[in-house]
Amino acid sequence: MAKNVIKRIFPKLDSVKEEKILKVFGPAVLQPNLWHINKKSVSRGFAIGAFCAFLPIPGIQMILAAFLSITFAANLPLAVILTWITNPFTYIPIVYFAIKIGGIFINAEFTYEIKNEQINIFTDLMQYWEPLFLGSFILSIISSLLSYILIRMYWRYYVIKTWSKRKKF
């Protein structure tokens, strides 16, 4: 199962205690349940990571995911790693899709024309901040709910499958 792979990849709590950068969060980051791999913490971690990934706040997504993980006792490493769904390669298509989605709800049409002069996408996008934020929030909610439900369903399926194999022996 993916649980065993994740356990091998993720750091152990003892090694986390020695990391200087994590001391900023204080003793809250050292709660053992933030580092355990179980159905509740993994599904919460996926939901938080997916939620933060689609918010249009690059650079702050990981900090927000860490804070929400501590608040809701979710798997901290998973939540932080999943914020990288939006990375330098995927950010522009996700922003475009978020603006399109937001535009549908507030009846704003999005047309972007690339000029031959200087391309400054972020300055040009400021005129579309309303559909961007609304669309990003909608994508965040949908992706977090879907990831939470799908992880819970997969976990249940895997446990049932494992138990049925044990019964055969």
List the model feature ranges, each with a label.
Residues 43-47, 78, 126, 130:
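Alpha-helical membrane-protein architecture signal
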Residues 35-61:
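Transmembrane alpha-helical segments and their cytosolic interface motifs
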Residues 47, 51, 81-85, 134, ...:
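Hydrophobic residues within alpha-helical transmembrane segments
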Residues 53, 90-94, 140-147:
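Alpha-helical transmembrane segments
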Residues 92-118:
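Juxtamembrane non-transmembrane "cap" segments at the membrane-aqueous interface
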Residues 1-40, 117-169:
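Terminal, membrane-proximal amphipathic helices
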